Amino acid sequence: MFMPDTRNWRGPHPKDLECFAPRWVPVLQAAVADLSWLLGRGYSSRASLKLVGDRYSLRDRQRKALQRCAASDDACLERRAKRLSPSDLEDRTVVVDGYNVLLTLEAALSGGLLLLARDGVMRDLSAMSAHYRRLRATLPAIELLAEFFASARCSQIIWYLDRPVSNSGRLKRLIQEIVAGR
């Protein structure tokens, strides 16, 4: 079994207190509105992010948050139309983007910054690389997910883990062990 990393990679970032201090909230909200407006009119996301980020003098981490939170009105409507409540999952097969869900939950459990995006989805600022590191929050995160899916009475859960990411096989076995124990 691979040992948990003692560092909280997906926990609070040293720059978060400054980058997301209360004085920045209205600035970031205005930036999200501007970027969303540009995206809704078909402008390039990369060029629009640079334009809006420069206009508001945003730092790299703030730009990353802006990119994760902004969405056109149409994209928001499409995503909200696909949203399901836990009761909708009963007797259904659920497909889980394993790293995406797990990293966000690990960030939350590690005290990392979570953002409520314009489409109503919670997002974190964790980045996935070619190497996955198990954290102290990994086991509790998987247990919470297993508990949620069990309470939602899903008929089957299919986890997708990117094969090129190192430790995917170990993470798969850990998930299987936890789910089998329920």
Regions found by a protein language model. Name each.
Residues 1-94, 101-182:
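Charge-biased, low-complexity intrinsically disordered regions
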